[in-house]
């Protein structure tokens, strides 16, 4: 990928990687093709049920031949300009990995953790936090994230691993594969940053119901809410047969 910043330009070898299921979202696929094609990047995918294993196998294919990897989730929405902006920030900032802001599905939180601070201690940042274009974070996501291959090669394998909690369950207090990666990433001497002024979309499936009492004539709910709430629509839905 040819990166231009002001009067300077450099060729950066970028590998776009995806861990994917057999079926996916066409909106995302067309988004990816339109975002990567202008930069001459063809995505590499590995299909399987286990996110971490698939992504590690993708990384292993390119870690010795490319400068950076761009990890992409199959529900992320972004543009060619997003890719260009993130790579420019990565190269200029000196960080070893850089993620954009992305909101968690079915939640009101952005997916990153402040260094040394648990979500129980703090869940917001001040306005002046955004004045610095890249801020250090402890963990992030893989939705549209650049990682230097030199940083990956510092890490021992496995790069991804799910760890149960002290009770041997995954119902809280456990470590998911993506968080395991970022913790090992930092332990290997690497720095992860978040682009405070660059965001990507997160596609999520909603259920829309007709309504006679709500302005606009409809009410919506997340699919998870429907299944976890006794298969009931939200208040204001009209005509539902229980």
Q: What are the language-model segments listed below?
A:
Residues 15-19, 33-35, 75, 87-89, ...:
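Polar low-complexity intrinsically disordered regions
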Residues 2-15, 157-242:
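C-terminal catalytic/acceptor-binding lobe
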Residues 1-49, 53:
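N-proximal low-complexity "stem/linker" segments adjacent to membrane-targeting elements
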Residues 66-77:
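Short beta-strand-to-loop acidic/aromatic patch adjacent to the donor-nucleotide binding site
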Residues 66-67, 93-95, 190:
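Short, high-confidence coil segments that cap the C-terminus of an alpha-helix
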Residues 42, 75, 96, 191-193:
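Residue-level detector of anion-binding/catalytic polar loops
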Residues 56-68:
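Active-site nucleotide-sugar/metal-binding loop of Leloir-type enzymes
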Residues 59, 79-165:
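Conserved catalytic core of nucleotide-sugar-dependent glycosyltransferases
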């Amino acid at each position: 990928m040819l990166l231009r910043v002001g009067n300077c330009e450099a060729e950066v070898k970028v590998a776009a990687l995806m861990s994917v299921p057999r079926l996916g979202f066409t909106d995302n696929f067309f988004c990816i093709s339109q975002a990567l094609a202008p930069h001459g990047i063809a995505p590499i995918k590995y299909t399987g049920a286990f996110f971490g294993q698939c992504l590690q196998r993708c990384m292993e294919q390119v870690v010795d031949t490319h400068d950076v990897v761009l990890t992409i989730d199959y529900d992320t929405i972004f543009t060619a300009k997003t890719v260009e902006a993130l790579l420019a920030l990565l190269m200029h900032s000196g960080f070893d990995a850089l993620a954009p802001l992305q909101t968690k599905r079915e939640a009101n939180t952005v997916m990153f953790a402040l260094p040394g601070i648990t979500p129980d201690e703090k869940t917001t940042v001040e306005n002046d936090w955004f004045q610095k274009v890249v801020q250090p974070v402890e963990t992030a996501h893989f939705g549209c994230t650049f990682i230097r291959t030199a940083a990956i090669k510092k890490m021992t394998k496995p790069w991804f691993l799910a760890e149960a909690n002290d009770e041997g369950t995954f119902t809280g207090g456990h470590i998911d594969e993506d968080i395991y990666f970022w913790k090992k990433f930092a332990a290997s001497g690497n720095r992860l940053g978040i682009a405070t002024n660059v965001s990507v979309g997160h596609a999520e499936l909603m259920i829309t119901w007709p309504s006679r009492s709500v302005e606009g004539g409809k009410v919506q709910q997340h699919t998870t809410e429907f299944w976890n709430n006794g298969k009931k629509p939200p208040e204001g839905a009209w005509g539902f047969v229980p």
